[in-house]
Protein backbone atom coordinates (compact mmCIF):
# COMPACT_ATOMS: atom_id res chain seq x y z
CA UNK A 1 0.00 0.00 0.00
CA UNK A 2 1.33 3.42 -0.93
CA UNK A 3 1.45 5.81 2.00
CA UNK A 4 2.09 9.50 1.41
CA UNK A 5 3.56 11.56 4.24
CA UNK A 6 3.10 15.29 4.63
CA UNK A 7 6.62 16.63 4.91
CA UNK A 8 8.36 16.02 8.25
CA UNK A 9 5.43 15.99 10.63
CA UNK A 10 4.89 12.24 10.64
CA UNK A 11 6.93 9.14 10.02
CA UNK A 12 6.28 7.11 6.91
CA UNK A 13 7.19 3.49 6.25
CA UNK A 14 6.44 3.31 2.51
CA UNK A 15 6.69 6.54 0.50
CA UNK A 16 7.47 10.05 1.73
CA UNK A 17 6.27 12.98 -0.38
CA UNK A 18 8.10 16.30 -0.30
CA UNK A 19 6.89 19.57 -1.77
CA UNK A 20 9.16 21.50 -4.11
CA UNK A 21 8.38 24.65 -2.13
CA UNK A 22 11.56 25.64 -0.26
CA UNK A 23 11.66 25.87 3.50
CA UNK A 24 11.97 29.30 5.07
CA UNK A 25 15.54 30.55 5.32
CA UNK A 26 15.36 30.76 9.10
CA UNK A 27 14.19 27.16 9.52
CA UNK A 28 16.66 24.85 11.27
CA UNK A 29 18.09 22.07 9.03
CA UNK A 30 16.14 19.37 10.87
CA UNK A 31 12.89 21.15 9.97
CA UNK A 32 13.75 21.66 6.32
CA UNK A 33 10.60 19.84 5.24
CA UNK A 34 8.19 21.19 7.85
CA UNK A 35 4.83 22.46 6.62
CA UNK A 36 4.78 26.14 5.76
CA UNK A 37 2.30 28.42 7.47
CA UNK A 38 2.38 26.52 10.75
CA UNK A 39 4.19 27.25 13.98
CA UNK A 40 7.61 25.59 14.20
CA UNK A 41 7.41 21.93 15.15
CA UNK A 42 9.98 19.29 16.00
CA UNK A 43 10.75 17.26 12.90
CA UNK A 44 9.97 13.56 13.10
CA UNK A 45 12.82 11.11 12.75
CA UNK A 46 13.33 10.17 9.12
CA UNK A 47 12.18 6.61 8.44
CA UNK A 48 14.61 4.86 6.12
CA UNK A 49 12.85 2.32 3.87
CA UNK A 50 14.83 -0.70 2.66
CA UNK A 51 14.51 -1.38 -1.05
CA UNK A 52 12.98 -4.65 -2.26
CA UNK A 53 13.11 -6.59 -5.50
CA UNK A 54 10.08 -4.53 -6.57
CA UNK A 55 12.23 -1.41 -6.21
CA UNK A 56 14.81 -2.87 -8.61
CA UNK A 57 12.08 -3.71 -11.10
CA UNK A 58 10.85 -0.12 -11.01
CA UNK A 59 14.36 1.25 -11.51
CA UNK A 60 14.84 -0.92 -14.58
CA UNK A 61 11.99 0.95 -16.28
CA UNK A 62 13.67 4.35 -15.67
CA UNK A 63 12.20 7.66 -14.59
CA UNK A 64 13.81 7.95 -11.15
CA UNK A 65 16.44 10.15 -9.53
CA UNK A 66 19.04 8.21 -7.57
CA UNK A 67 21.06 10.04 -4.92
CA UNK A 68 24.33 8.26 -4.12
CA UNK A 69 26.60 9.23 -1.26
CA UNK A 70 30.34 8.97 -1.97
CA UNK A 71 32.53 6.23 -0.49
CA UNK A 72 34.28 6.13 2.90
CA UNK A 73 36.68 8.94 3.70
CA UNK A 74 39.51 9.58 6.17
CA UNK A 75 37.91 11.69 8.90
CA UNK A 76 41.30 12.41 10.47
CA UNK A 77 42.04 14.69 7.50
CA UNK A 78 39.23 17.27 7.41
CA UNK A 79 38.48 19.72 4.64
CA UNK A 80 40.83 22.68 4.98
CA UNK A 81 38.07 25.22 5.51
CA UNK A 82 37.99 28.00 4.38
CA UNK A 83 40.93 27.27 2.08
CA UNK A 84 39.44 24.30 0.22
CA UNK A 85 40.74 24.29 -3.35
CA UNK A 86 38.62 22.21 -5.72
CA UNK A 87 41.68 21.72 -7.91
CA UNK A 88 43.85 20.49 -5.04
CA UNK A 89 42.65 17.28 -3.41
CA UNK A 90 45.20 17.70 -0.60
CA UNK A 91 42.99 20.49 0.81
CA UNK A 92 40.01 18.13 1.12
CA UNK A 93 38.94 15.14 3.21
CA UNK A 94 40.16 12.22 1.08
CA UNK A 95 38.45 9.10 -0.17
CA UNK A 96 40.11 6.04 1.35
CA UNK A 97 41.09 2.94 -0.61
CA UNK A 98 38.27 1.10 1.18
CA UNK A 99 35.90 3.85 0.05
CA UNK A 100 37.14 3.55 -3.52
CA UNK A 101 36.64 -0.22 -3.50
CA UNK A 102 33.18 0.23 -2.00
CA UNK A 103 32.22 2.47 -4.91
CA UNK A 104 33.57 -0.06 -7.41
CA UNK A 105 31.25 -2.64 -5.84
CA UNK A 106 28.26 -0.27 -5.82
CA UNK A 107 28.79 0.58 -9.48
CA UNK A 108 29.10 -3.12 -10.32
CA UNK A 109 25.87 -3.81 -8.41
CA UNK A 110 23.97 -1.10 -10.30
CA UNK A 111 25.09 -2.58 -13.60
CA UNK A 112 24.36 -6.15 -12.48
CA UNK A 113 20.86 -5.02 -11.50
CA UNK A 114 20.38 -3.63 -15.04
CA UNK A 115 19.54 -0.15 -13.75
CA UNK A 116 19.99 2.29 -16.66
CA UNK A 117 21.78 5.57 -15.91
CA UNK A 118 21.29 8.38 -18.42
CA UNK A 119 22.55 11.39 -16.43
CA UNK A 120 25.40 11.48 -13.93
CA UNK A 121 25.63 14.69 -11.87
CA UNK A 122 28.58 14.87 -9.51
CA UNK A 123 29.78 17.20 -6.76
CA UNK A 124 33.09 18.96 -7.55
CA UNK A 125 34.68 17.70 -4.32
CA UNK A 126 37.50 15.21 -4.94
CA UNK A 127 35.91 12.45 -2.87
CA UNK A 128 32.78 12.64 -5.02
CA UNK A 129 34.63 12.84 -8.35
CA UNK A 130 36.87 9.92 -7.38
CA UNK A 131 33.83 7.92 -6.25
CA UNK A 132 32.16 8.55 -9.60
CA UNK A 133 35.28 7.44 -11.48
CA UNK A 134 35.45 4.24 -9.43
CA UNK A 135 31.76 3.38 -9.74
CA UNK A 136 31.10 4.48 -13.32
CA UNK A 137 34.36 4.40 -15.30
CA UNK A 138 32.56 4.33 -18.66
CA UNK A 139 30.21 7.25 -17.97
CA UNK A 140 31.01 10.94 -18.49
CA UNK A 141 30.00 12.80 -15.33
CA UNK A 142 28.73 16.36 -15.32
CA UNK A 143 30.44 18.25 -12.50
CA UNK A 144 27.83 20.41 -10.82
CA UNK A 145 29.21 23.10 -8.50
CA UNK A 146 25.78 23.45 -6.96
CA UNK A 147 26.24 20.00 -5.41
CA UNK A 148 29.08 21.18 -3.15
CA UNK A 149 29.42 19.86 0.41
CA UNK A 150 27.32 22.21 2.55
CA UNK A 151 28.22 21.30 6.13
CA UNK A 152 30.70 24.18 6.49
CA UNK A 153 28.58 26.76 4.66
CA UNK A 154 26.43 29.61 5.91
CA UNK A 155 22.67 29.47 5.30
CA UNK A 156 23.10 31.88 2.40
CA UNK A 157 25.82 29.74 0.83
CA UNK A 158 23.76 26.58 1.28
CA UNK A 159 20.60 27.98 -0.32
CA UNK A 160 21.48 27.57 -4.05
CA UNK A 161 22.89 24.09 -3.43
CA UNK A 162 19.81 22.88 -1.59
CA UNK A 163 17.58 24.48 -4.24
CA UNK A 164 19.54 22.71 -6.98
CA UNK A 165 19.31 19.38 -5.16
CA UNK A 166 15.56 19.85 -4.81
CA UNK A 167 15.33 20.61 -8.53
CA UNK A 168 17.30 17.50 -9.49
CA UNK A 169 15.09 15.31 -7.30
CA UNK A 170 11.89 16.90 -8.64
CA UNK A 171 12.57 17.21 -12.39
CA UNK A 172 11.06 14.30 -14.36
CA UNK A 173 13.49 11.91 -16.06
CA UNK A 174 12.67 10.79 -19.59
CA UNK A 175 14.06 8.32 -22.10
CA UNK A 176 13.73 5.11 -20.09
CA UNK A 177 16.75 5.82 -17.90
CA UNK A 178 17.48 7.27 -14.46
CA UNK A 179 19.31 10.36 -13.23
CA UNK A 180 22.10 9.69 -10.73
CA UNK A 181 23.33 12.42 -8.38
CA UNK A 182 26.58 11.62 -6.56
CA UNK A 183 27.11 14.00 -3.68
CA UNK A 184 27.08 14.37 0.11
CA UNK A 185 24.97 13.30 3.08
CA UNK A 186 24.69 16.76 4.74
CA UNK A 187 23.05 18.14 1.59
CA UNK A 188 20.27 15.55 1.78
CA UNK A 189 20.03 16.10 5.53
CA UNK A 190 19.36 19.78 4.92
CA UNK A 191 16.63 18.96 2.41
CA UNK A 192 14.70 16.05 3.97
CA UNK A 193 16.34 15.26 7.31
CA UNK A 194 18.10 12.09 6.08
CA UNK A 195 21.81 11.36 6.53
CA UNK A 196 22.57 8.24 4.43
CA UNK A 197 25.67 6.15 5.06
CA UNK A 198 28.56 6.01 2.59
CA UNK A 199 27.72 4.24 -0.66
CA UNK A 200 23.97 4.24 -0.01
CA UNK A 201 21.76 4.66 -3.08
CA UNK A 202 18.62 6.66 -2.28
CA UNK A 203 15.67 6.35 -4.67
CA UNK A 204 13.35 9.28 -5.44
CA UNK A 205 10.41 9.57 -7.81
CA UNK A 206 10.28 13.06 -9.41
CA UNK A 207 6.85 14.69 -9.55
CA UNK A 208 7.68 18.01 -11.19
CA UNK A 209 8.42 21.53 -9.98
CA UNK A 210 5.07 22.04 -8.24
CA UNK A 211 4.64 18.64 -6.59
CA UNK A 212 8.27 17.97 -5.69
CA UNK A 213 9.33 14.36 -5.22
CA UNK A 214 8.61 11.11 -3.38
CA UNK A 215 11.20 9.26 -1.34
CA UNK A 216 10.82 5.61 -2.35
CA UNK A 217 13.56 3.55 -0.68
CA UNK A 218 17.28 3.18 0.07
CA UNK A 219 19.85 0.58 -0.93
CA UNK A 220 22.76 0.50 1.57
CA UNK A 221 25.80 -1.36 0.20
CA UNK A 222 25.11 -4.47 2.31
CA UNK A 223 21.58 -4.83 0.90
CA UNK A 224 22.59 -5.55 -2.70
CA UNK A 225 23.33 -9.23 -2.01
CA UNK A 226 19.85 -9.82 -0.57
CA UNK A 227 18.24 -8.06 -3.52
CA UNK A 228 20.10 -10.23 -6.03
CA UNK A 229 19.11 -13.33 -4.05
CA UNK A 230 15.44 -12.29 -4.28
CA UNK A 231 15.87 -11.51 -7.96
CA UNK A 232 16.93 -15.08 -8.76
CA UNK A 233 14.28 -16.94 -6.78
Residue ranges and their predicted role:
Residues 155-163:
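Short, surface-exposed amphipathic charged segments that create phosphate/polyanion-binding patches used
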Residues 8-19:
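Bacterial N-terminal signal peptides
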Residues 1-4:
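Positively charged n-region of N-terminal signal peptides that target proteins for export
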Residues 21-25:
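Sec/Tat signal peptide C-region and signal peptidase I cleavage site
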Residues 27-145, 150-154, 194-202, 207-212, ...:
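Active-site-proximal alpha-helix that buttresses catalytic centers in soluble enzyme cores
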Residues 63-65, 177-183:
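Generic beta-sheet signal
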Residues 163-173:
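A short, acidic, amphipathic alpha-helical segment used as a generic capping/interface helix at domain edges
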Amino acid sequence: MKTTCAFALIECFAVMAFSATPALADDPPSAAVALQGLAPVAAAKFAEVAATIDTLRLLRTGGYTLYLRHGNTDNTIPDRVPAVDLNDCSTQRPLTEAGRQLMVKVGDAIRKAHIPIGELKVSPMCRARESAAAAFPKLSPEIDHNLMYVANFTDGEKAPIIANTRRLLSTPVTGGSNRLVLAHAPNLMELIGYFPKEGTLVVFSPRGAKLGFDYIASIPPALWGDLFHQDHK
